[in-house]
């Protein structure tokens, strides 16, 4: 026993001397950008293997008009019941807009800039997987190439995501380089995807126009001990003037008129609160 004591003591000293791995030791930074040309130099700031995560709405793509835009979605939350611009079953109407509307790149050179980046890439959106068709169409029409699947995965995957063990399950989908998370915490959803794919990146760079998404990703990666750079993309103007509000109200009334004439049962379902999304 006495012979073992010096060995045990030496091991104890070595353990105390070794630096502890703490989540708060991970590098974490956030900055504003208004040009996607700034993504490439940000990726090159370290020699670490880096995963580039890109939001879609108002980051890669934006709506040509106010109705159906990301800003319109936020405006909907402020409208009182009975306002002629407030839509019933908001996410059903959003899905209709995705299927029928058009979007453009947030900046003319955006697709070329993003397509040229050699890093592992992931498009991470809050959109529902049921809106996948319209999402892929608008990305293609704008000139964006879909990223290669991470880890060389041959097929996509869909699963019930829970942000906490007792949380309600929400269906998410990762396929063709696009991760659709149905409004879930993007940081927690990304970690769940990487865990399921048995992948690890020492550094993640997120480009997103939403401050909440930037902050959620920062919190999740810090807790996981992963270095993080959040690039808050501010190019798209979020202000709403009276002309926008008028367009928002007129847009929904135009939809109502079309649905009433062509698909009255769907309009009745929407206005009765029978939401599919």
Which residues does each PLM region occupy?
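Sec-dependent signal peptide recognition
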Residues: 2-7
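C-terminal cap/substrate-recognition subdomain and adjoining C-terminal extension
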Residues: 19-27, 33, 37, 51, ...
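Alpha-helical substrate-recognition element adjacent to the catalytic core
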Residues: 20-166, 174, 180, 277
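C-terminal motif of bacterial Sec signal peptides marking the signal peptidase cleavage site
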Residues: 14-15
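Short, linear, compositionally biased motifs with a strong N-terminal bias
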Residues: 10-11
